[in-house]
Amino acid sequence: SKLSEKEQHMESNLLCFKRTPTLTALSLPKTYKEGFFTESGVWTKLIIIKGKMKFAFLNLENELIRQYSLNPKSNVELIKPLSVCRITPNSTDLQFQLEFYCSREDFFYNKYNLNTPHSEFIDAIKVVNPCKTLDLGAGKGRHSLYLSLLGFDVTSIDYNAEFLHELTDISIKEKLDINVIDHDIAKANIKGSYDFIFSTDVFMYLNPTRIQSIISNIKQQTHLNGYNLIVSALNATKHGRPLIPLPFTFIEGELKEYYEDWKIISYSENITASPYPYAMILAQKVSE
């Protein structure tokens, strides 16, 4: 089947997160011979090193849809997510490997078990081009690492040394250059200035008396035409949502008011979100 342009573009952006050791006709796990599922969001590449195999696509009842005879010279397309496949050795000297690929968004989840980036964050960075960026309360770095992968110049700050250690570790393994700083956000004294400052799921863990100073500080340290993105918990008790046992929740409209002197690119209050309602803002500094 010919790949559409969209599929070709998608596949050219995939990243390999795992590779099997070399499998042989003798060491081939039983599941491969009986029929195995490829996971959601995971493309599989078959690399035949030596020998021959029969590769079959099956339906959900394990009945044959189509089958190919393959050898090291065969041109094998990527196996799409949620396919049912079966591998049958066709020579005793068969040797092959499988490589597993996913989108950039899912890469650090699949390889390091980090949470995937927040959906609001993914939408926001469609607006923001790679630039000098501050991740305020980076945690283990699910957003910092993703942005660094996309070519952003990232500084990550957090007050949890263990998380920062993990973030540094992954960035070294992936050869990503991230500036990692142990810093207490509540001090509201960020020194450097940035084109993009963002904070997702962080404000709700901070002391409520510090929120105004922190937002004022990050607005000040944002370059002209730069952006701020904040996503944090929202009090939606009047909509029947339970009170959230967190140190701080924005009330309706509050987050938007903090940015009334900026250009608001998008603002929303997601009342039905799980596990808790949240407010999000993406705003641009249009005047000093």
Q: How should each PLM-predicted stretch be described?
A:
Residues 201-202:
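Short catalytic micro-motifs in class I SAM-dependent methyltransferases
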Residues 136:
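Conserved beta-strand/loop positions that form the S-adenosyl-L-methionine
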Residues 22-40:
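Conserved short histidine dyad/triad with adjacent acidic residue
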Residues 102-128, 139-178, 182-192, 206, ...:
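Class I (Rossmann-like) S-adenosyl-L-methionine-dependent methyltransferase catalytic domain
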Residues 198:
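A conserved beta-strand element that flanks and buttresses the S-adenosyl-L-methionine
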Residues 44-54:
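Short, conserved beta-strand element in jelly-roll/cupin
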Residues 61-81:
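Short acidic-glycine-tyrosine-enriched beta hairpin
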Residues 80-102:
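Ligand-binding loop in jelly-roll beta-barrel domains
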